[in-house]
Amino acid sequence: MLTIVNGVTSKQVLANEIINLLETMGLDGYFYLGYPVLGGIDGKIKVDALLVSEQTGIVLFDLETLAEENMEDKIQLLDELYNNMEAKLKRYGYLSKRRVLQVPINVLSYAPLYKTKSDEICTSIEEVKEYLESLEWKQGEEYYKKLLE
């Protein structure tokens, strides 16, 4: 069962599309919307949405409501989200095995107005579904409960 934890977001339409998709996929876990924050070097970084699931691990969502701008900037944002989440999780030794983090971190941007897509930039909800279906957390059974602690 998926538990949805709603915060405040200005991107509710895109968030609802993701929520509807996740509910049809039968994932177990938590979907946090509108308030997950990561600490970065330059201050706090807001994450539009965060999925924590035994099947997928962690998925950080960037919900983009604007038309395509600079792809390099978007990729840099996704890298920054990944790096900050990795740094946060590595503080918890019980999530690693021999210095290797056992929780997969995935980032994607759902940007339906973009014309250009990439591995991490999905321009349709179908692409988001394909991306999520491609994820597998082999150590999920062992580390999922630890992740929620």
Predicted regions and their residues:
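Intrinsically disordered, low-complexity Ser/Thr/Pro/Gly-rich regulatory segments
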Residues: M1-V47, L51-E149
